[in-house]
Regions:
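N-terminal signal peptide c-region/cleavage motif recognized by signal peptidases
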Residues: 5-7
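Catalytic glycan-binding domains that act on GlcNAc-containing polysaccharides
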Residues: 9-157
Length: 157
């Protein structure tokens, strides 16, 4: 089990506030998406975890950024196409969004990951509700799945 220490949580909250100020996406929305996407548990409390991968539907939590990036790079080199790889706190899908990043390591960076997710949520909102944007973040073409996902994310705060 991995634990975000109090200083790390303070730093995480500062990062969320900074990204919220830059993008206009409410801090609570960003935090809810991060926590839902990369959740780990400590003392029964859900928390986000930065060194998280999801490969083919299987969540993996790593102790360090280096180990997570190395594992992801091996998966990408194995020749299976397309690799179903979600990266970092906000579980950005490499197949759909990887071309926006120089490397998996860059996408794994918490600031880059959260910043990209917040900008993506902002783009998805398109004058609609944050609930709609959150649902489209997960399932842009399946409204039933999108609503279920948004409900699960929003129930966390």
């Amino acid at each position: 089990m991995f634990i975000l220490s109090l200083p790390a949580m303070a730093s995480f909250n500062d990062l969320l506030e900074s990204v919220s100020d830059e993008t206009g996406v409410p801090t609570e929305i960003i935090k809810a998406v991060c926590t839902h996407e990369s959740q780990s548990y400590h003392n029964g409390k859900r928390q986000p975890w930065p060194w998280t991968l999801n490969i083919g539907g299987k969540g993996l939590w790593f102790k360090t950024k280096h180990s997570a990036v190395a594992y992801a790079e091996l998966e990408l080199m194995d020749g299976t196409e397309p690799v179903k790889l979600d990266v970092g706190m906000c579980q950005i899908n490499w197949y759909w969004h990887g071309n926006e990043f120089a490397s998996v390591g860059e996408l794994m960076d918490p600031r880059a990951n959260i910043q990209y997710a917040a900008n993506h949520l902002k783009d998805l909102k398109k004058g609609k509700s944050w609930e709609y944007a959150i649902g489209a973040y997960h399932s842009p073409s399946n409204q039933v799945r999108a609503k279920k996902y948004a409900s699960a994310v929003l129930s966390s705060f």
